[in-house]
Each structure stands twice: as structure tokens, then as C-alpha cells.
């Protein structure tokens, strides 16, 4: 039954625009009219925290301030007293070149042939000593010496770069050593083909490998992780604690042609330790063929042509000339220049691995300004914004465990430094070209299968890259948007699943794939001329393309399988509909609907049935009569539409004004806003929002869903408000009221869920008569709560506050019960003579927690994971040092207690009964036992501390329906006391209203298409 008739009166557009200007003047900060100062307030080995202060403007006299974190591996080094910015260059002093202004220290000898000519000290003080020895070809058990290192003198040719010309006998080659703030690199630089044809050594070019041997005389203890590859090949990741050697590459100096993988092995031969890099001749030769056959006659060529062959590595090592074992020729470094003629390079890098754990925190903006690596546990929280500087090296590489915590309306967004549409405005806002190299580079060696979902990448050279994800531990990219990048996805040596991904405005969708199994479903590829491009043989990889839309993206040269895919070439200009910042909806009358015929992954299908290809409805003007909004766009519950699906938006608004009427939201409706305020409650208005336990109403910023900035929308740095109550001239009688249940708020981090605090604009400017928030989720942002009269009430019951915070002050009555305040800030200013109550809540890692004004009435609260506490300490509080939560298959959210016990957990520790708390049909347990049925301890009538989820059926995954009449218990027994006699407006959850008894519920979903 509708709460109100669906009627909407629209005032003229001029008045609406005045309202928008008012909100912008109040909240929006115009960066162009401000002076900006930056201060570094914290430094670490790989990061710095920057505070930004923007001066005031006539519209915002107070100005603006914010903070961001800049990341780059090796950004600083510790000089014994403080962190200093790294300066990766060599100080050249006679026989030595020393780089000591980085966390790792490098020393090179002028004559590379001397023993221990290359020395590296890792950030943790471990020493690595080595020198290159020779190149050899191998085919099966046969090995042939190609060239030995000879006396050669180093030249400083530029900041951080030393070159040893004429480094080998018999071939025209050099060795280059580069020091950077994040690592150290050796390049073997080949100038022509002389002496490098495997056929000259009686070896099969299809099976031979070229090897570069280096002797390691001292090294930290290593940990080697095998990386199984295609065709029974294996590479290893070699970790030395704070530094590691990853897979190298062979490539042309001009950047054209493929990057050929360089494999490694590391260990002892004949009692000595060697690092051996190898490259397959069949791929490597296509690089060498781009070089001239000969550059200049080599006086030692005749010796090389003698072709020495060996059947064991020991025999080969024994044959080396004494000069290569130990050289004593005196030499000094000199300055030189690098001849930038075409060459082929074989490289390896010893890089800092940053084993520390890291969190990309929801609500924060990060700037990746150089190569950034993590090998500890890296956590990505939905709502984090990761920006990249525009240079050739800004990248994010992960080789350790990944915890990916993103969800619908909480994507992880990776974009350019100059993109001010999201996150804090840390640059000019003038976008040009592509920024990061590999925006997200994921290595799967030794890791379990990984699901990356709800991700958006913009303005990268390559958006996502993966390597070493096998059939047993595949990498899945799901529900992602990749826009305005050079390349979308690059996969090597592994199994990759790319599902429900939008790729638009790219140069190529899939690039440089190599020995990859790529299984795609529900792709939309648009404004992208090439579906694939690789300089390797495409036949060594396989493609499956199911239920996808390839619009004007050439698949020439690619053989793929799959079903339900529409390929249009040249591209259609009418295939998609655009609304707001979403440019890839299907028109409602599209003939493509329901044409996705392929059988797809079960979980992917379940997700898509909750998503849509239909653009939202647009709501403009002002609500003047009681109005109810329900879902308006079609969820894909019947035969699947092909192509990428969006997380649904039902109604797109700039700012929705509500005056003298009640706005109702129901049944999981989603409202997205583009302005600085979402819903503006004016005099005489009310908001009544009630979703469903398993399908909550949502109020969100449009950027949480749509891939591009919308015309006229405010930027990411604007402080926005989902529900705004700023009004002049209101009294308690005409003040707005807010009543929300089963409603999720996503206004953007640093913004407001609800702004009702008194202060700005007069004593009653933000006055509200009543705020009731129950069973709601607040992600990021602030709940700013206040009223300047004791007749007003604010009641918070059983809500989740995820990061962000709560600020409350004023004269109203206030209570908070059964909250989970997770990593949130709490600020409370209670009026004199008040009885503000805080009971049965869990404060998890909250900081800061500040309180001023009158004393609070608080007891029976849980403080876990180091959370700060309300003061003074209360006798019945629970303080638990380590507490965690769980998700469960078929459950609602990942907030069930892993320790649901009385002895050590939060079970039955509350201040009142579950009936008084209204949580009879809720639970904190993974087993879905509702409070009313839980007899696990002697005090089982007492409510469990903290946030509860509605108990669901373990067979259907839907909220429990005891009497099987199709109405959930929690909706029939609205006050949640499980009383035998229902209260007014309730029905008995034990007795079927339909007369069906207690049989399993028959749930009828009317297809919306």
C-alpha cells in the first residue's frame, strides 16, 4: 500500500536554479578563486601526508582545508635523525660511484670486471654483492659460451645512470646500471646481432634460451616463490626481505615491439651462487631482428667463432678465462654521454618491496607519484580515491595478499591527479592524456584466487595488469568501469575473468596478452578502436567472449569463442543512451534486450539480476504535495541483457526540494544527486524512508555509479549533503522531520549524510523537530545532528556508521543504542541538565572520541580494537583488544560477530532486553538465530551489544518469514518486541494473514521488463 499518492508539482526552472546557487554558495569551494598552501605534516619511508589550506572567498570566507597522502616506494630515506627526500644519483669519486641518498645504498666499481663490482645495501642493512660474468645459449643439456665480461670502465651519463661500454668480448654490448628511489636496475644493452644467432651455436632457435649469468658473492637470506607458467615453464620471485627481484623483460630501446619475459633462477653451481636470467630465443629473436647484423668489426670475433660447447654448467664455469674471475686493472669513472642508437635491452630490477601492511582508507584521497609496491597485506576500501601523477613511472604494484572491500555504491576509484570530479582537488583540474603506467598491477604468485569488484579506472596508460594467476587461483575483475585509458587489461601467464566491465574511450581493450586464458562476460566495449592488440603470437592465448557488446572495436586477427555477443563494426551511434554521467545504458526500446544467451557464472548472474541497463528517471523541480518514490528502472530479472550493467539509480536529481509535504521512499529505491545537496527539506516538510532489510533504500552521489562527470555537477572537492535542512524562518512546528529505516547513505566521504546542526545562519537555521534513524547504514561522511530546543528529539537505533563520524550538539533529547561505530570519529556536546544516553553500542577503533558540556549517561557499551572511550569509564562496559566480523553465504552484510559468546564476546551484554530494544528478529550470529530464539546463555533475554542484522532464512537468503505468508517477521512486528498480542499497525508474525499457514513463502517477482 502506498503511503502517499504519487504526485509531483514542479516549480519553474528559474527558482530551481536559484536554489542550486544558494546551496553552492553555502557549501561549494571555488578552487580557482583561492590561494592554496601545502604543508607536509608526516613522512615515512614510502609516503608523506600533505595538509592543504585554501584561503577564503566571498562565498566561503572560512576557506577550506583537507588532507591527502602521497605514495611512492622509497620516497624518503632515514639519515639517522629524520626522513629526507630521496635523491637517486651517484657521487662519482675516482674508482667508485656511490648512491647513498636513498633507502638502499649502491656502490659501483669503475672496472665492472673486478670482483664485487656491484654492491647494494638494502634498507634493513643487508648487503648484496655481485658482478655479471657472461652470456650463454642453452638448448636442453647443451650450453655454449657466447661472450664473457671484459675489463670496461664506467661512465656517468646522467642522474642515477652509469654505463659500461664495450662490456663483453665478441659482441657489441654495454651494461647500464640505474639507481632510482625505489630500486636498482641492470640492463644488458645489445647494439647488433653479431654473435647472438643461436643457429651459429648449432642450437634450435625455437627451443634455445639466451642466459645472462651473474656471480653473487654475498646476499641476504632469500625466499623464492615459484611462478608456474605456460608450457611447463617456471619463473621465481626472489625476495630478500625489504627488496626483491621480480620478473624482468627484454625490449627495444625505442619501445616498439613486444616486451619479452625474462626468467630467473637463483642458487648454487659448483659451490658458488649465481643469478641466471634467461630469455626464450623464439620471442627474443624478433627483437634482435630489428638491429643491424654488424655495427663495426670486432677484433675478438675470431675467438668467439671457435664456439665452445659444454654439457654441464660446471664445465662451462671452469672454462672461463682468469680475467673474468678476478680483474685488477686500475680504473676511474669518467663522465660520458649515451649514444641513443637503437638497441635491445635485457633488464632485471632489485626493488624495494615494502612489506608493511597498508590500507587505502575509505574517504581519503591518495596520490601515487612514482612506482609504488606493496608486498604485505594491502586493503582497498570502497570510497577510497587513488590518483596518479602524470609521469612515465607512476604505478601501483601488489605482490602480497589483497583484501578488497568495495561494494555497490562504494567503488574504489583510480584516476588522474588532475581529475577533480572525485576526491580532493589536489591539482589544476586540467586533464590531458594518460597518467599512470600500470594503474593496478597484480601478481598472483603464492596468492589465493582474487576477486576485484566495483572498481573504476580512468586516464591510465594501462588500467589493470595481471601476471601469474593460475587456473586454481584466477584473477577476476567484476563490475568495473575502465574509461579514457590507453589500454584496459593486460594479462600474462594465467587465467583471467573479466566480467561486467565497461571499457570506453580506450586505445585497446586487451593489450600485450601472453600465455593468458581470458574469459569475459558482459563486456561493453565502445569508442575503442581495437578489441585486442599484442605483439606476441595470439594463438598462445585463448579468449571467451560471452553476452557482450563490442561496438566499433575491431577483433581482426583474434579467434574467440562464446555466445550472446553482438559485434558491430563500424560502431553504432545509437546503441547506447546517455543520462547524467552514465553514457552506456541501453535505450528502453533497444532490440538488444534479453539477447544475452550464454550460460554465465552463478554469482555473476545473481549480481546482474540486481543491476540494470536502463537509465534512471530524472526528477526536477520541487515536491509540494505528499509524494512517494519507488524503484522506477528495470532490474535485469528476466533473460539477461548483453553488455555491462550499472548499479541501479532509479531517480537522478540535482537537488530535490521538499516544501510543506512528505517525501516517502520505499522498496529499495535509489536516489542519486549531482548537486551539493541531495534532498533539501524545507519548512513543513518530512522525509520518511523505509526500504527492505535485504534491499535497502539508497541515497548516493551519482559518482558512486556513473563513469563520467555529469554536466553541471559539482566536483569531488565539494562538501555535499545527502539530506539538508538549512532554512530560515522556521519554528518547531514547521521544522522538517526525518524518519529513516533500512536506508543506506553514500554522500561521498568528507560530506554529510544528514546536516541538522544548529549554528550557521542563526539559532534555528538547521532546526529539525525529530530525527529517527533505525537499521540504517552510513558510509563515510558525517552525521551532524542538533536542534536548539529541548522539544526536539534525535533517536539513533541499530545503525552502522562506517568511518566518517557523528557530531551532535544542541538542546534536544538524544539517544544512541545498538550502534556499530566502525573507525568513526565521535564528537558530543551535551546541554546542561540533559540526559543524553549511549547504551549497548560498539565503538570499534574510534578516534577521536571527544565530549564536552554536560555529563553523558552511558553504560553497557563495547570498546574494541583500541577504540577510545566515552568518559568516565562505566562499570558494565566491555573492552576487547581484538574483535572481528564475518560475512556468510546468504547473509546480508559482513558484520556478524566471529566471537558471539557471553564469555569473551558481546553476546547478552546489553542494558535491556531484546524486546525493549526492538531487535527480536535481528541477530549478530552467522547462524541466523534471531534474538527471540537465542537461548545460548542464561541471560539470553538481554540484547547483544552492537549492530544487528535482520535474521535471514538459511535456505532462501531472505529475511525470516515464520508464518510463510510472504511478509517478513521484521515487517509484521514493526516494533520488534515479538509480543504475543501485536501492537497497533502490526500483524502476528506467527499467524499467516493469507491463510497459507507456515509453509514456505511463495515470492512472486513481477518482471519489470
Question: Could you tell me what each predicted segment is?
Answer:
Residues 642-644, 908, 945-960, 970-1005, ...:
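Proline-centered structural pivot motif
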Residues 271-812, 822-893, 899-960, 970:
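Beta-strand/loop edge motif enriched in small/polar residues
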Residues 29-33:
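Signal peptide processing junction and immediate N-terminal pro/mature segment
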Residues 2-19:
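Bacterial N-terminal signal peptides that target proteins for export
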Residues 16-28:
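Bacterial N-terminal signal peptides
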Amino acid at each position: 500500500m502506498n503511503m502517499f499518492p504519487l504526485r509531483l508539482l514542479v516549480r519553474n526552472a528559474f527558482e530551481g536554479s536559484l536554489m542550486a546557487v544558494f546551496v553552492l554558495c553555502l557549501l561549494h569551494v571555488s578552487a580557482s578563486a583561492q590561494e592554496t598552501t601545502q604543508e607536509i605534516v608526516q613522512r615515512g619511508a614510502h609516503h608523506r601526508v600533505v595538509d592543504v589550506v585554501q584561503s577564503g572567498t566571498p562565498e566561503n570566507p572560512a576557506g577550506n582545508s583537507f588532507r591527502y597522502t602521497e605514495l611512492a616506494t622509497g620516497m624518503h630515506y632515514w639519515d639517522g635523525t629524520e626522513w629526507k627526500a630521496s635523491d637517486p644519483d651517484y657521487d662519482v669519486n675516482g674508482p667508485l660511484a656511490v648512491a647513498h641518498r636513498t633507502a638502499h645504498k649502491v656502490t659501483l666499481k669503475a672496472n665492472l670486471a673486478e670482483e664485487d663490482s656491484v654492491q647494494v645495501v638494502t634498507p634493513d642493512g643487508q648487503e648484496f654483492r655481485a658482478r655479471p660474468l657472461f652470456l650463454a645459449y642453452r638448448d636442453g643439456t647443451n650450453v655454449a659460451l657466447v661472450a664473457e665480461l671484459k675489463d670496461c670502465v664506467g661512465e656517468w651519463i646522467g642522474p642515477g645512470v652509469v654505463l659500461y661500454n664495450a662490456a663483453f668480448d665478441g659482441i657489441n654490448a654495454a651494461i647500464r646500471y640505474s639507481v632510482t628511489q625505489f630500486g636498482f636496475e641492470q640492463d644488458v644493452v645489445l647494439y647488433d646481432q653479431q654473435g647472438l644467432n643461436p643457429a651459429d651455436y648449432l642450437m634450435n632457435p625455437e627451443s634455445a634460451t639466451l642466459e645472462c649469468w651473474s656471480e653473487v658473492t654475498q646476499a641476504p637470506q632469500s625466499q623464492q616463490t615459484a611462478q608456474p607458467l605456460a608450457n611447463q615453464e617456471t619463473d621465481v620471485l626472489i625476495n630478500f626481505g625489504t627488496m626483491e627481484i621480480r620478473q624482468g623483460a627484454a625490449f627495444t630501446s625505442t619501445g616498439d615491439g613486444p616486451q619479452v619475459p625474462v626468467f630467473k633462477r637463483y642458487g648454487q653451481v659448483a659451490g658458488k651462487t649465481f643469478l641466471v636470467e634467461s630469455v626464450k630465443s623464439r620471442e627474443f629473436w624478433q627483437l634482435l631482428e630489428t638491429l643491424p647484423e654488424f655495427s663495426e668489426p670486432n677484433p675478438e670475433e675470431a675467438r668467439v667463432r671457435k664456439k665452445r660447447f659444454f654439457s654441464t654448467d660446471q664445465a662451462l664455469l671452469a672454462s672461463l678465462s682468469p680475467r673474468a674471475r678476478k680483474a685488477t686493472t686500475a680504473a676511474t669513472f669518467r663522465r660520458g654521454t649515451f649514444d641513443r642508437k637503437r638497441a635491445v635491452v635485457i633488464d632485471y630490477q632489485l626493488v624495494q618491496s615494502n612489506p608493511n601492511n597498508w590500507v587505502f582508507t575509505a574517504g581519503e584521497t591518495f596520490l601515487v607519484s612514482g612506482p609504488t609496491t606493496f608486498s604485505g597485506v594491502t586493503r582497498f576500501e570502497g570510497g577510497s580515491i587513488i590518483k596518479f601523477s602524470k609521469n612515465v613511472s607512476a604505478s601501483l604494484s601488489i605482490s602480497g595478499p589483497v583484501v578488497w572491500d568495495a561494494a555497490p555504491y562504494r567503488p574504489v576509484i583510480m584516476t588522474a591527479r588532475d581529475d577533480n570530479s572525485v576526491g580532493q582537488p589536489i591539482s589544476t583540474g586540467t586533464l590531458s592524456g594518460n597518467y599512470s603506467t600500470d594503474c593496478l598491477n597484480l601478481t598472483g604468485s603464492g596468492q589465493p584466487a582474487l576477486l576485484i569488484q566495483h572498481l573504476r579506472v580512468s586516464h591510465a596508460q594501462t588500467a589493470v595488469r595481471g601476471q601469474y594467476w593460475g587456473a586454481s587461483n584466477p584473477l577476476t575483475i567484476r563490475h568495473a568501469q575502465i574509461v579514457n585509458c590507453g589500454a584496459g587489461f593486460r594479462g600474462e601467464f594465467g587465467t583471467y575473468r573479466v566480467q561486467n566491465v565497461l571499457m570506453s574511450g580506450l586505445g585497446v581493450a586487451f593489450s600485450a596478452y601472453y600465455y593468458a586464458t581470458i574469459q569475459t562476460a558482459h563486456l561493453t566495449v565502445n569508442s575503442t578502436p581495437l578489441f585486442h592488440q599484442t605483439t606476441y603470437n595470439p594463438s598462445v592465448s585463448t579468449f571467451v567472449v560471452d553476452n557482450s557488446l563490442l561496438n566499433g572495436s575491431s577483433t581482426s586477427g583474434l579467434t574467440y569463442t562464446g555466445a550472446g555477443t553482438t559485434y558491430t563494426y563500424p560502431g553504432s551511434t545509437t546503441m547506447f543512451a546517455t543520462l547524467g554521467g552514465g553514457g552506456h545504458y541501453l535505450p528502453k526500446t533497444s532490440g538488444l534486450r534479453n539477447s544475452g544467451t550464454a550460460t554465465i557464472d552463478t554469482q555473476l548472474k545473481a549480481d546482474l539480476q540486481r543491476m540494470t541497463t536502463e537509465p534512471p528517471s530524472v526528477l526536477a523541480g520541487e515536491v509540494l504535495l505528499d509524494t512517494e518514490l519507488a524503484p522506477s528502472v528495470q532490474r535485469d530479472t528476466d533473460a539477461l541483457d548483453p553488455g555491462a550493467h550499472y548499479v541501479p539509480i532509479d531517480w537522478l536529481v540535482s537537488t530535490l526540494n521538499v516544501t510543506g509535504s512528505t517525501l516517502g521512499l520505499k522498496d529499495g529505491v535509489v536516489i542519486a544527486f549531482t548537486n551539493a545537496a541531495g534532498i533539501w527539506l524545507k519548512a513543513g516538510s518530512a522525509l520518511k524512508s523505509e526500504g527492505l532489510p535485504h534491499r535497502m533504500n539508497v541515497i548516493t552521489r551519482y559518482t558512486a555509479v556513473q563513469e563520467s562527470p555529469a554536466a553541471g555537477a559539482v566536483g569531488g572537492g565539494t562538501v555535499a549533503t545527502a539530506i539538508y535542512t538549512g532554512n530560515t524562518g522556521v519554528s518547531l512546528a514547521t521544522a522538517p522531520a526525518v524518519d529513516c529505516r533500512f536506508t543506506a547513505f553514500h554522500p561521498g566521504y568528507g560530506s554529510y549524510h544528514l546536516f541538522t546542526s544548529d549554528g550557521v545562519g542563526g539559532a534555528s537555521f538547521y532546526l529539525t523537530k525529530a530525527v529517527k534513524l533505525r537499521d540504517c547504514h552510513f558510509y563515510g561522511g558525517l552525521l551532524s545532528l542538533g536542534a536548539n530546543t529541548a522539544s526536539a528529539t534525535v533517536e539513533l537505533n541499530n545503525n552502522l556508521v562506517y568511518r566518517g563520524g557523528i557530531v551532535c550538539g544542541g538542546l534536544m533529547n538524544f539517544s544512541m543504542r545498538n550502534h556499530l561505530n566502525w573507525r568513526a570519529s565521535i564528537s558530543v556536546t551535551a546541554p546542561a541538565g540533559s540526559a543524553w544516553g549511549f547504551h549497548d553500542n560498539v565503538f570499534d577503533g574510534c578516534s577521536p572520541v571527544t565530549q564536552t558540556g554536560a555529563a553523558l549517561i552511558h553504560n553497557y557499551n563495547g570498546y574494541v580494537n583500541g577504540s577510545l572511550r566515552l568518559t568516565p569509564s562505566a562499570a558494565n562496559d566491555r573492552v576487547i583488544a581484538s574483535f572481528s566480523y564475518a560475512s556468510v553465504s546468504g547473509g546480508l552484510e559482513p558484520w556478524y560477530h566471529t566471537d558471539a559468546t557471553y564469555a569473551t564476546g558481546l553476546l547478552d551484554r546489553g542494558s535491556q532486553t531484546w524486546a525493549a530494544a526492538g531487535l527480536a528478529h535481528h541477530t549478530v550470529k552467522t547462524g541466523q538465530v534471531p534474538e527471540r530464539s537465542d537461548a545460548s546463555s542464561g541471560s539470553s533475554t538481554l540484547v547483544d551489544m552492537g549492530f544487528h542484522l535482520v535474521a535471514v532464512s538459511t535456505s532462501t537468503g531472505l529475511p525470516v518469514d515464520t508464518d510463510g505468508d510472504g511478509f517478513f517477521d521484521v515487517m509484521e512486528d514493526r516494533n520488534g518486541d515479538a509480543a504475543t498480542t501485536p501492537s497497533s499497525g502490526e500483524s502476528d508474525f506467527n499467524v499467516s494473514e493469507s491463510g497459507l499457514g507456515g509453509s514456505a513463502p511463495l515470492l512472486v517477482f513481477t518482471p519489470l521488463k
